[in-house]
Amino acid sequence: MARMKLNARMSTGGKAPRKQLAYKAVRKAAPPTIGVKLPNSYRPGDQTVCKPAPPTDGVKEPHRYRPGKMGLREIRKYKKNARFFISKLPFHRLVRKITQNLKAHLRFQSTAMPAPEEVSEAYLVKLFEDAIHAKRVTLVPKDIQLARCIGGVLA
């Protein structure tokens, strides 16, 4: 069967808007409702009372994640990279302050500082891993004390 040639039509910019049904127009014009469901058989003559939405003044509420989700996300993030969690300069100041109490005028080479940093960080990470149990989101001091007792270091 041979194809017929069609004449090109001039575009009008889309379809003409369809007429809305009365109940749809009323539903769109009504203020937004909270917690009140409109019945399926809504008719314009019905006397349904809808609560108006509280004024938000254009301020959007921040998104909240479930408890513990952000913590697990941070754990995964920090497991991927190989840098220290403890800031370098505050840790170096703390080490110098502690060593000044033991022996005055003690100096450190810059290459010697990563060693105590790595050891202390490994100890803290292990302690926190042991302290997290029972699917808790918050670490409680008694959990850390228990982890220290089990690990061999007295509280």
From Swiss-Prot:
Residues 34-59 are annotated as: Disordered. InterPro entries: Histone-fold, Histone_H2A/H2B/H3, Histone_H3/CENP-A. The keyword Phosphoprotein does not apply. It comes from the Eukaryota. Signal peptide: none annotated. Gene3D superfamilies: Histone, subunit A. This is Histone H3-like 3. The gene is leH3.
